[in-house]
From Swiss-Prot:
Pfam families: IMS, IMS_C. HAMAP family: DNApol_IV. This is DNA polymerase IV. GO terms for cellular component: cytosol. It comes from Acetivibrio thermocellus (strain ATCC 27405 / DSM 1237 / JCM 9322 / NBRC 103400 / NCIMB 10682 / NRRL B-4536 / VPI 7372).
Length: 399
């Protein structure tokens, strides 16, 4: 059976939901931010009116307001967005049980076996588009294709409120002329490497020798070559299929450039608290800590190191992340953003190898401390309990 894959992308999702609840904002440039009090708060989403002023996701509030003085800044309401995401998913699940989330605002649907009931992929896509608009009051762009990568490309090609079809017969004409960074998983770093090889479009990538790409990019080179040529065969997960968590991490763009080790240490603790809490909430612990460091020119360095024992203890994660940073960064440039991630995960009650060098009594106390902090924050809010190190710079500890 020929596959029929949809990719549904709710347009300007956060901003669209806010405008739905605040109709007076509908014709104004709007940005949704993590913090509206802090001028260094980050833009999480924006509407089309703000896009006309070249407001970008990920830039600071003050940068956005410099571009658009009339910008209306709204504090993010994640519980509301989650509710709308769930409503959209219920509509998708009317057509298929194969619905795979890609963030709150995007989903893949495999409707291959649904076409006998509901019509072809284009008909299903248009029906979903109309229902989302009618029942939820927001719009969605839908890509229709025979694989996940091209379906995602299709939903990106026409916005808002549109359906784009990419077939086996016309994909070269429709997508090979697009910039290579339009392809799924081609980020800034990979784009730069490909551009240095004179690969600027998806067609350039598709027409490279796969062996050459493997030599330059490793196994990932072959994967990207396959994507560009339409060979993606990855399945859409069933909606009742629980995908195992392989890593837990968090990253932040600092409200100002970090200029010394103590700045970095503070931000690493902020990130490690988030990572540790999420590990504990999922009943997981990990043995490998990864960090990513981005400079003001957006160049990224990634490093990792192992721990002596699996852990979800915040202070152990932070200490290892800071050790990696000290070994990896020579301060030839400032630091713009940091990320901390824990991998090599196992369930917390899994028997693991004992380290001869760990202090079990001290570790038990730290585990109890973290659990107590989690409970207090759950009841009274995140800022009800703070580590002393985070009081050294209030500009960093409130992000």
């Amino acid at each position: 059976m020929k596959r029929v894959i949809l990719h549904c992308d709710l347009n300007n999702f956060y901003a669209s939901v806010e405008c739905l609840y605040h109709p007076e904002l509908r014709d104004k440039p709007v940005a949704v931010c993590g913090s509206i009090e802090d001028r260094h708060g980050i833009v999480l989403a924006k509407n089309y009116a703000a896009k006309k002023y070249k407001v970008k996701t990920g830039e600071t509030v003050w940068e956005a307001k410099n571009k658009c003085p009339g910008l209306v800044v709204v504090k993010a309401n994640h519980s509301l967005y989650y509710k709308f995401s769930k409503y959209a998913r219920q509509i998708y699940e009317y057509y298929t049980d194969r619905v795979e989330s890609f963030g709150l605002d995007e989903c893949w649907l495999d409707v291959s076996e649904s076409t006998l009931l509901f019509g072809d992929g284009t008909k299903i896509a248009n029906e979903i588009r109309e229902r989302i608009k009618r029942e939820l009051g927001v719009t969605v762009s839908v890509g229709v294709s025979y694989n996940k990568v091209f379906a995602k490309l299709g939903s990106d090609m026409k916005k808002p409120d549109a359906v784009t079809v990419i077939t086996e017969n016309d994909f070269k004409e429709k997508i090979w002329g697009l910039p290579v960074e339009a392809l799924l998983y081609v980020g800034d770093s990979t784009k730069k490497k490909l551009n240095n090889m004179a690969v600027f479009t998806i067609g350039d990538l598709a027409n490279c020798h796969s062996e050459f790409l493997v030599r330059q990019l490793g196994k990932w080179g072959y994967t990207l070559w396959s994507f560009a040529n339409g060979y993606d065969t990855s399945p859409v997960a069933k909606n009742d299929c629980e995908i195992p968590i392989k890593s837990i991490g968090n990253s932040l763009t600092a409200p100002r450039d970090l200029t010394n080790n103590e700045d970095v240490r503070i931000l690493i603790y902020v990130l490690s608290e988030s990572v540790g809490e999420r590990l504990r909430s999922h009943n997981l612990k990990g043995r490998t800590v990864q960090i990513s460091i981005k400079d003001p020119e957006l160049q990224t360095l990634e490093r990792q190191a192992g721990l002596d024992i699996h852990t979800s203890i915040t202070s152990e994660i932070a200490q290892k992340a800071y050790e990696i940073f000290l070994k990896s960064w020579n301060w030839s440039k400032n630091v713009r953003a940091l990320g901390v991630r824990v991998t090599d995960l196992v369930e917390s009650d899994t028997c693991t190898q004992i380290s001869l060098f760990s202090d079990d009594i001290k570790r038990q106390k730290l585990e109890i401390l973290d659990e107590c902090v989690d409970r207090v924050r759950e009841r009274f809010g995140y800022y009800s309990v703070r580590r002393g190190i985070l009081l050294q710079d209030r500009g960093l500890n409130r992000i």
